[in-house]
């Protein structure tokens, strides 16, 4: 990445587009504190996360950022319900079965809650990962091709639900996508080329 300066407002839905290898995922990783820039800062809620220790950054991510990446990282030793509520348990928050069910119904996985996630299709696993990311209502939701394993109709349906949830809870959503239909749903599109915003 080179000479990138972007500002994203609270409750804004931003889509990042560009050809493969242009730096979209790297930018997303920087915004989520998964990588450090060689120069510059990353401010979230007036906190420069590049200055946080690894422990502080991990805690900050847990409380403020939800991730939906292409690698779902579901835990096979837990059922679907337990995977969804895991971040809340790590944060020592109360678990609302009603809220889990509401999200699961929206994502059409309500009948899978007691199953092992490894027995589900790729699309169903992706919906479990989405449910897990949004269950704690993070300040920022980051997604890398978050509907990549879903068919076109389901992709649009899931994105409409995510957009509704973000508006309801004043969340900011930043996603990387190659799908122009998904990008068209965003408030703003950032185009990248050769490591730069164009």
Residue ranges and their predicted role:
Residues 1-185, 189:
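ABC family nucleotide-binding domain
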């Amino acid at each position: 990445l080179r000479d990138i300066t972007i500002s994203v407002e609270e409750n804004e839905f931003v889509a990042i587009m560009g050809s493969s290898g242009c730096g979209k995922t790297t930018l997303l990783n920087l915004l989520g504190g998964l990588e450090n820039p060689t120069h510059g800062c990353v401010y979230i809620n007036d906190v420069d996360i590049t200055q946080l220790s690894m422990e502080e950054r991990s805690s900050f991510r847990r409380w403020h950022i939800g991730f939906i990446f292409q690698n779902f990282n579901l835990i096979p030793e837990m059922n679907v319900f337990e995977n969804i509520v895991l971040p809340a348990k790590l944060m020592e928050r109360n678990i609302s079965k009603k809220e889990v069910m509401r999200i699961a119904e929206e994502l059409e996985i309500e009948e899978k809650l007691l199953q092992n996630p490894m027995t589900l299709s790729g699309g169903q696993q992706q919906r479990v990962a989405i449910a897990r990311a949004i269950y704690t209502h993070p300040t920022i939701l980051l997604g890398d091709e978050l509907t990549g394993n879903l068919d076109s109709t389901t992709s649009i349906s899931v994105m409409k639900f995510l957009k509704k949830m973000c508006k309801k809870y004043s969340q900011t959503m930043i996603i990387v996508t190659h799908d122009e239909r998904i990008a068209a749903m965003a408030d703003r599109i950032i185009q990248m080329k050769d490591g730069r915003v164009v």
